[in-house]
Amino acid sequence: MELNNADMEHTGEGYMYSTREKQGYGWSHPKRPQEMSENSELGLYYSWAYASAGISYAMKTGDDTYIKQSGMTEGDQKLFKSIALLEETREGKYWEESGNFIYRLGSDHPEKKGEEYSWPYRLQMFHGDFYVRNGEVHEIPENTDGWGKIVYSDGTLKARYLDGAWQMEGFFEGIATNTVGNPFDK
């Protein structure tokens, strides 16, 4: 089962895909679904979908606003900021052709132990055929040392419902911390 952020409402006027010459723009940003505040599997699902959409949006724009609003733990937010080139992306100095993160759920339902839920996933990171850094175009190989056009990573999302919201961690399990958005020209 794919975690489908397409089920969510997005706002924005439409967009232009990134090219080798120009960074994409006009990306629609996720709109927070009401179901996120529910203490239910559906609430957890929509919270995860919102965070997933926020990750892809940040990879394209450098804006991590929706990640901050998503219920992702501070630890996972810090990890993401350390491995993604958000500032360079915001300044138009770095972009990838794609920059999409898609989570595929390992089961139809999360496992619950006490107050903690766990949900296995397979993450597909779509980087595309190229990235641009400081005006220089770099072709992305199929897969080299854990980085390439499409990269897969398995992990388990862990979540608790606290104070009327989902707190989630484990978004980037299994990702080499020096590879996401930080390719070969370090």
Where are these regions (language model features)?
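Exposed beta-sheet edge and beta->alpha loop/turn motif
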Residues: M1-E9, E111-K186
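Amphipathic alpha-helical interaction segments
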Residues: S56, I102-Y103, G174
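Arginine residue identity/basic-tract feature
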Residues: R20, R32, R90, R104, ...
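Short coil-to-beta-strand transition motifs
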Residues: W95-G99, K149-Y152
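Short amphipathic beta-strand and strand-loop transition segments with alternating hydrophobic
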Residues: F101-K112
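Core segments of small alpha/beta cavity-forming domains
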Residues: G12, Y17-E97
